[in-house]
Amino acid sequence: MKNILLATALLVISMYGQSQTKVFKEVNQDVSSEIKAIVQDGSLVGYVLFTELEKASDKTFNYRVTIMDENLNDIGTIKFEDEKLLLQQVAFEGDVLCLAYIKSNFIGKAFDKVRDFRKQKAAGVRDSIFTQFVSLDGKIINAHSIKADITSDGEYDHVKKKVKGEGELKHQVQLKNIAGTGFAMFYGDENKNQLVTYDLRGAQIIKKRIKDKGDDFALLTSGTDVYILVRTDSHDKTFGSEYSMLAYRPSDSTTLPKYKLTDKRGNALKVIAFNNDPVTGKPFVSGNIIERNALKYDNVKEMKRGAYVGVFTINFKSTRKADVTESYSYWNDGSAPMFMGNGLISEKDAFARQTLSFRDYSGNTYFVGSSVKKKMRWGAIAGAVITSPLLVGPVLFLAGGTQKSKTSDVVVMKQTKKGDLTVENSFKSDAGKYFQAKTPVDVYDVRSYYTVTNPDEKISYLICYDYDNITIYNVNEKKVMRTIPRWKGSLETSVFPAKEGHILVAQYDKKQKSRSFSIEAL
């Protein structure tokens, strides 16, 4: 979660019911802050407000880190001076907070003149991954810097009339806690992908270069084990990918066997969830099964042809074959009666395109996404027929094809532990507009999702972001609990995960130039 504030000054802290609210007001354009969630074992346990204050010198800045609990109460503050820092990730374990930054003498810095920018770049760019270990009372326990090779350049800011140094890692910093042990961090620069682990004193345990090649990497910790999911895209054949699971045990420096994810029918996969099971605490991977000869374009024409052939869930106790259980559910073999062979949901006359997956407390895997409808462009076809003697007319009318598509209801599917697949429910969201059927669905399916859970009551909630509204859906009760407008007058509202069973509602008032954050129970 990230919200950039041009500047912050705390105006009010108020308590009402089960909600606490903080309001921040913009007061100085030279001060910037961002708020990030503190995560432990996948659960949000607090927040960090990272503020860049005034310059301390030509090369350094003053910084303030405010530590807040899950109810937005301040519990500690640290102030320090350093080069330009860009906060990436925050994790918590054993009363120690680990913050990971990109440190640079170039990236993120603003230069008044182009010649100053060129002079700095010619003098040499120094980039590093900077980790800081902080106690809850605001004391810095330890800190480390690892040199990073980042391709950098400049971008001219036409508003501030300055040149800003730009650059980013090839694979962004990922930081997780290791239960009872410390922290694991992964990042990839231009020359290497690296896993680094630390103990609770901030001492480095492992620094390991990941030699496996991939287009993307995802880090997850489970107990004392560290997992990395490697994705390799086909690039020239299908929009599915190949995946491998790497695993390490920092406690004794063990490297576990690599496990390749495959459905045994030669199909490609598309992972949409890599997380820990809420009951066992062990990793699972779930997603779509893509037909082996599917084209690279993820559009409704390919869906009609049968590009999506099912869904899968793979459970890991470790990456040893005996510790892995797989569940593949296909609709192209007739084993899922609610689906046609090409994935069309019979009762909805629409294709389900799953973009989120999660587990419940009964061992079921859920798949969520927009239903996609296809329709003939009868007006264009009629126009082409009428103007057929003119030759040019049909070309103009049929330039967009004879079919169109759009997103419709949100569909919730369930795969049981036995692999049975059903459509559990659907609910309405903002109405989408029609696009040419050959248009990739990513272009017009703007919905995004995440989940919030209540472990005590074993309830899962689904949060759906759409064009104009945010919908909160109770998965257990199969009903919409609340709909929140994203835009109302001068207010812009966003909703983020908070502590278990709660959400964080963030509102920006354009007129008052203020931001408020409140924790609300579901």
Regions found by a protein language model. Name each.
Residues 82, 143-165, 259-268, 321-348, ...:
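Surface-exposed loop and turn segments in beta-propeller and other repeat-based domains
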Residues 20-86, 187, 241-243, 280, ...:
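Start-of-domain marker
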Residues 71-116, 145-165, 207-224, 229, ...:
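Blade-loop segments of beta-propeller domains
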Residues 43-58, 90-121, 132, 174-189, ...:
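Short beta-strand elements that form the blades of beta-propeller/WD-repeat-like
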Residues 1-24, 522:
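Bacterial Sec-dependent N-terminal signal peptides
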Residues 219-232, 237-364, 369:
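Long, internal scaffold/assembly segments composed of regular secondary structure
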Residues 30-39, 80-92, 150-174, 212-223, ...:
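Repeated scaffold domains used in trafficking and secretory/extracellular systems
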Residues 62-71, 115-139, 195-201, 240-254, ...:
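Beta-propeller blade signature
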